[in-house]
């Protein structure tokens, strides 16, 4: 097969999930290299100083190592689901919502889910801050089926991996919160063929193995 982009990924990482979602829906053929976070391959570390996933290696001296940038790059090449907003106002709203997810929500999600790692004794404080974001999503869903309209778009797929992580931290608590529209939105996206397709389990990549090709037609 011709030289293809190489995606360094980790199945359960929400940043890597959002990258895989966009690459898959755009039918961007690439080689998938599953990474063990406990034994990151030397090739990944050489490519990106951050040493974190996802990293998309496009050519010898070109990489994309920010998940949202990978999404936008893939969708600008091919966007059959019309994920990218067509007007400036909706795009600005989309990016603002994603930024809220990636900044305040993710900061507090980490301290809720991994309290001891951050020396947090009362994780419910951080859960409560995260809850305000869930409330915002629920309010948006009063007006339409998805966050930006009646079809799923960039905002939904960039954010849903993080809401999945939040919900899985304490599912009983999450599904007893008064945000039924957010619950329904999450469940619908997680049960979709698209999401299930990007969650296939693979062993960690090692040098010399048979390549795994990741795209919508495989």
Predicted feature locations:
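Short, flexible loop/turn segments with low-complexity composition
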Residues: 84-90, 196-206
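GST-like domain detector, emphasizing the conserved glutathione-binding G-site
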Residues: 1-131, 138, 143-145
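Surface-exposed helix-capping loop/turn segments at secondary-structure junctions
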Residues: 139-150, 194-199
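Alpha-helical transmembrane segments in multipass membrane proteins, preferentially the mid-helix core
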Residues: 136-137, 167
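Extended, well-ordered alpha-helical scaffold segments
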Residues: 125-129, 177-191
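A structural signal for the main folded, soluble domain(s) of proteins
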Residues: 22, 192-195
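Acidic/histidine-enriched, glycine/proline-rich intrinsically disordered or flexible terminal extensions
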Residues: 202-218
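GST superfamily/GST-like fold recognition
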Residues: 147-172, 178
């Amino acid at each position: 097969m011709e030289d293809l982009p190489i995606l360094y990924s980790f199945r359960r990482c929400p940043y890597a999930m959002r990258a895989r979602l966009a690459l898959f829906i755009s039918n961007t053929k690439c080689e998938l290299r599953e990474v063990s976070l406990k034994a990151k391959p030397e090739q990944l570390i050489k490519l990106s100083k951050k040493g974190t996933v996802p990293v998309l290696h496009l050519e010898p001296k070109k990489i994309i190592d920010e998940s949202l940038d990978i999404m936008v790059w893939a969708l600008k090449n091919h966007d059959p689901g019309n994920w990218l907003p067509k007007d400036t106002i909706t795009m600005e709203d989309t990016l603002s919502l994603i930024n809220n997810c990636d900044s305040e929500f993710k900061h507090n999600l980490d301290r809720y889910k991994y309290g001891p790692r951050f020396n947090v004794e009362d994780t419910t404080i951080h859960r409560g801050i995260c809850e305000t974001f869930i409330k915002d999503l629920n309010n948006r869903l009063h007006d339409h089926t998805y966050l930006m309209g009646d079809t799923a778009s960039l905002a939904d797929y960039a954010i849903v991996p993080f809401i999945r992580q939040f919900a899985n931290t304490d599912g009983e608590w999450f599904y007893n919160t008064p945000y039924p529209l957010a619950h329904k939105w999450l469940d619908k996206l997680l049960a979709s063929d698209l999401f299930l397709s990007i969650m296939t389990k693979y062993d960690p990549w090692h040098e010399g193995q048979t390549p795994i090709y990741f795209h919508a037609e495989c």
